[in-house]
């Protein structure tokens, strides 16, 4: 049994030798072949989940493949500072000690965050190592390291100077816990709420209009009531005034096409400071903008007696007051979509605030370059999603009300001058005042990670880390990056932003190829969640099975564009595969103590030539699939070669030609190189066992050359495929007459291609030994009184002269009778209209399928009986 505990030792040896670094494969590097892939930097607070495991596995397969194929490879690792998440973790720890961050002040709090990062952050890095991934660890970056801080400042200042970053009062998404959010940080969910119909009386009149709203707590901020200009019901009221309940403030009735006449009563309140659409209406009609609660969602002085209440708590009390005063006409159940903060699940509020924004015009160049095909998406349909999102792009809110993060490099002096600077200024550049302060907000985390594809290669770092973790030629060698692999769920959060931020600076898209994988779900296709109890923890899977088994399972399931349905059964299947190739090693070493490298021997055995031809087909298919990111097809090709071609038939056939074993072992060693990017540890172990070496004192398989395809004579494959077909067919025919493992005197083979028998005569020993026949004869006619098995290219006959058929016929008749009874029962059930009408659909379908299977079995037994009776 393979010892998975070797994985840690093997990994440590390879890392210490520097194999993962850019020049780790220097002995096999070829000129002008560079490959770069960026690790999506996981949060410093994170632990390895199954989505990470998939991303990192696929990235590492490509990294190892390219490294073995002679490329100079950079697999860039890193961690994201994760502004909100990290600040929340440290805040909670301090609160547990009875300390609020405000008591410490900004500088001391940030020191605490750095302390936490050094002590507890980055746990995920060790978990990545257990997965066996091979990034250039010496180049590990953190989105808050000094070099990347320099790059962020440079990017910000350049955009600021181009007026592509601006500050102003905007309607934004606001979380009362986490502050400003960009549009894609808001998750919309179905909500079972209420629609409140409130009476707004006309000024100096007993007439009233009924306004429908889902958010009565905001009505103190109403500055108009709105109807559709074509709604004849309300035409006479336009330009008149209504009186707000409770506050008794007069507001105007306006007409605007934004109103849906069919919604509620056709009359809606306009709250420009608390609704995205009303904000636009307010601008069009020059309305007042009145905010009725603060940044924490607490109602302010505009709300009279309700001041000091939290917005959602206030709703019930405001409605109760309106009801007591007779202003509520009715309340209806109402389903709608509500935005929630993607981090804390708090209801998000539209809120007017002075924030920093990146103008949407920044994306234009990247849109044009994608249209020209400079980046290719896998699967291709993601280009449609990318284009649709970019087409509807809005200005991106990049300021966050946090302390942990990249503080916005904008300064304000006492004379109200504003400027951006990459370095802390000494005086105001306009008035030379020394009395100035820096903007207190920090940048959205995605702003810094949006520079990742170029900042990790030294762009904007100034001299920090130069010649230690990056070099001057990195941008030339590795930009644009060769490939990005990540989940489709961050296409807009991260990928699109990297594309427009990098292109705006370097005028070149950051990636040649973009592979977006789907989600990892359970075997029933459900999302993994703690509540369902269906979460597969990769850390536990590695402990129970091994890193190799998890990696190969994920690769087998990674079909482009389809969700990955992972289960323990799939992991067990790959464990069986691992045992299969481990046992192949045992068989080989029973016959030989050591196997030469394939390049150092000449193949003489016909069997070895056949297995080598199958291996070359495998090489061709694996390379082609990896080059097109069809990971599942590449893994399946390897699975079939090792299991079917080598273990099932190569080893089996070698029992008839013992001299072939030495050559088969050399082929097996070469095939382990092909497997290594997928299963690096067991391939390493088996390779050294067959070479009679140890990794401690020998080079690793991971820096050997990846096998290249060499065309082979197809005739040897044709001959051996007929041999195998003959063996299988004879075994099948023997099983029909209960002679499964017994030796028989003679079998006859009738080939569809009569010419082939002359070529195959030399190989009869394989059939005689493995099919257990004393003799094989060729026939050109069907034999009477013989059991027959028909396959694609031949027919097998075994005469029945000396076979007692009575017991066999009785057994088959009994089987037939049993199947007929089961078939009759199912047929009766499916002919019953009541059963069809009342049974669950899936039960009906299962019974139909069972009936079809019974028919097939009955037909097969009938044919067998007919053959036996002549």
UniProtKB/Swiss-Prot annotation:
Keyword hit for Disulfide bond: no
One GO CC term, this protein: cytosol
GO BP annotation list: valyl-tRNA aminoacylation
Domain of life the protein comes from: Bacteria
Motif stretch ('KMSKS' region): 527-531
Catalytic reaction equation(s): tRNA(Val) + L-valine + ATP = L-valyl-tRNA(Val) + AMP + diphosphate
Enzyme class: ligase
Bridged cysteine pairs (disulfide): none
Subcellular location: Cytoplasm
Residue numbers covered by motif 'HIGH' region: 42-52
EC number(s) reported in the record: 6.1.1.9
Record's keyword annotation contains Coiled coil: yes
GO MF: aminoacyl-tRNA deacylase activity; ATP binding; valine-tRNA ligase activity
Pfam families: Anticodon_1, tRNA-synt_1, Val_tRNA-synt_C
Coiled-coil segments: 800-870
Stated role: Catalyzes the attachment of valine to tRNA(Val). As ValRS can inadvertently accommodate and process structurally similar amino acids such as threonine, to avoid such errors, it has a 'posttransfer' editing activity that hydrolyzes mischarged Thr-tRNA(Val) in a tRNA-dependent manner.
Record-stated family: Belongs to the class-I aminoacyl-tRNA synthetase family. ValS type 1 subfamily.
Domain notes for this protein: ValRS has two distinct active sites: one for aminoacylation and one for editing. The misactivated threonine is translocated from the active site to the editing site.
Protein name as catalogued: Valine--tRNA ligase
């Amino acid at each position: 049994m393979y010892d998975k505990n070797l994985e840690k030792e093997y990994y440590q040896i390879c890392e210490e030798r520097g194999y993962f670094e850019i020049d780790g494969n220097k002995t096999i590097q070829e000129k002008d072949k560079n490959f770069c892939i960026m690790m999506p930097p996981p949060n410093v607070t994170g632990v390895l989940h199954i989505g990470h495991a998939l991303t990192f596995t696929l990235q590492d397969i490509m990294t190892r493949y390219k490294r073995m194929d002679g490329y100079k490879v950079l697999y860039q690792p890193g961690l994201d500072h994760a502004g909100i998440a990290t600040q929340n973790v440290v805040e909670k720890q301090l609160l547990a000690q009875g300390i609020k961050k405000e008591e410490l002040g900004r500088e001391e709090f940030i020191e605490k965050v750095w302390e936490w990062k050094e002590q507890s952050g980055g746990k995920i890095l060790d978990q990545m190592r257990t997965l066996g991934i091979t990034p250039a660890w010496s180049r590990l970056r953190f989105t808050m390291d000094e070099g990347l801080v320099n790059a962020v400042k440079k990017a910000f200042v350049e955009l600021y100077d181009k007026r592509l970053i601006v500050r102003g009062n905007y309607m934004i998404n606001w979380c009362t816990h986490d502050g400003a959010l960009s549009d894609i940080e808001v998750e919309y969910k179905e909500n079972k709420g209420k629609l409140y119909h409130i009476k707004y009386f006309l000024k100096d009149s007993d007439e009233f209009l009924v306004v429908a709203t889902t958010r009565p707590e905001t009505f103190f901020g109403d500055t108009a009531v709105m109807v559709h200009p074509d709604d004849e019901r309300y035409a006479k009221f336009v330009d008149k005034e209504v009186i707000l309940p409770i506050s008794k403030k007069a507001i105007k009735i306006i007409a605007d096409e934004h109103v849906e006449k069919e919604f509620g009563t056709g009359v809606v309140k306009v709250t420009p400071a608390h609704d995205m659409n009303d904000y636009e209406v307010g601008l069009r009609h020059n309305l007042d903008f009145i905010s009725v609660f603060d940044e924490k969602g607490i109602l302010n002085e505009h709300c009279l007696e309700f001041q000091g209440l939290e917005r959602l708590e206030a709703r019930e009390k405001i409605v109760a007051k309106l009801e007591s005063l007779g202003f509520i006409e009715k309340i209806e159940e109402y389903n709608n979509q509500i935005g929630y903060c993607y981090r804390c699940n708090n209801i998000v509020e539209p809120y007017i605030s002075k924030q920093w924004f990146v103008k949407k015009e920044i994306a234009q160049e990247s849109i044009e370059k994608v249209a020209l095909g400079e980046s290719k998406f896998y699967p291709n349909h993601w280009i449609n999603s990318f284009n649709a999102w970019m087409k509807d792009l809005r200005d991106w809110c990049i300021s966050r009300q946090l302390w942990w993060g990249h503080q916005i490099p904008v300064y304000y002096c006492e004379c109200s001058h504003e400027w951006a600077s990459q370095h802390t200024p000494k005086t105001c550049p306009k008035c030379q005042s020394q009395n100035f302060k820096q903007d207190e907000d920090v940048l959205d985390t995605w702003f810094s990670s949006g520079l990742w594809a170029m900042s990790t290669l030294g762009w904007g770092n100034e001299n920090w880390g130069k010649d230690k973790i990056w070099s001057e030629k990195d941008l030339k060698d590795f930009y644009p990056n060769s490939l990005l692999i990540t989940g489709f769920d961050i296409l807009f959060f991260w990928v699109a932003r990297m594309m427009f931020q990098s292109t705006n600076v370097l005028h070149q898209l950051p990636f040649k190829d973009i592979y977006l994988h789907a989600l990892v779900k359970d075997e029933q296709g459900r999302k993994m969640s703690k509540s369902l109890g269906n979460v597969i923890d990769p850390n536990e899977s590695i402990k129970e099975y091994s890193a190799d088994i998890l990696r190969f399972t994920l690769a087998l399931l990674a079909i482009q564009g389809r969700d990955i349905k992972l289960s323990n059964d799939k992991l067990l299947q790959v464990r069986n595969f691992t045992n299969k190739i481990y046992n192949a090693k045992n068989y080989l070493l029973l016959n030989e103590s050591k196997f030469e490298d394939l390049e150092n021997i000449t193949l003489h055995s016909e069997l070895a030539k056949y297995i080598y031809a199958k291996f070359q087909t495998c090489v061709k298919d694996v390379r082609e699939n990896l080059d097109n990111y069809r990971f599942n097809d590449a893994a399946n090709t390897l699975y079939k070669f090792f299991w079917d071609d080598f273990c099932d038939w190569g080893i089996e056939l070698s029992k008839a030609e013992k001299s072939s074993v030495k050559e088969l072992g050399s082929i097996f060693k070469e095939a382990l190189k092909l497997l290594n990017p997928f299963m690096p540890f067991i391939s390493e172990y088996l390779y050294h066992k067959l070479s009679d070496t140890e990794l401690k004192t020998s080079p690793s398989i991971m820096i050997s050359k990846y096998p290249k395809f060499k065309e082979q004579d197809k005739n040897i494959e044709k001959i051996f495929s007929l041999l195998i077909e003959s063996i299988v067919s004879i075994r099948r025919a023997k099983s029909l007459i209960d002679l499964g493992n017994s030796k028989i005197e003679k079998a006859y083979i009738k080939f569809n291609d009569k010419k082939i028998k002359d070529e195959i005569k030399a190989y009869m020993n394989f059939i005689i030994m493995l099919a257990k026949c004393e003799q094989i004869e060729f026939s050109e006619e069907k034999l009477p009184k013989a059991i027959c098995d028909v396959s694609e290219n031949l027919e097998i006959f075994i005469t029945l002269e000396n076979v007692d058929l009575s017991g066999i016929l009785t057994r088959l008749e009994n089987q037939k009778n049993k199947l007929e009874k089961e078939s009759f029962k199912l047929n009766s059930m499916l002919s019953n209209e009541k059963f069809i009408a009342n049974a669950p659909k899936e039960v009906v379908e299962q019974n139909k399928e069972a009936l079809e299977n019974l028919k097939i079995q009955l037909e097969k037994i009938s044919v067998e009986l007919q053959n036996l009776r002549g």
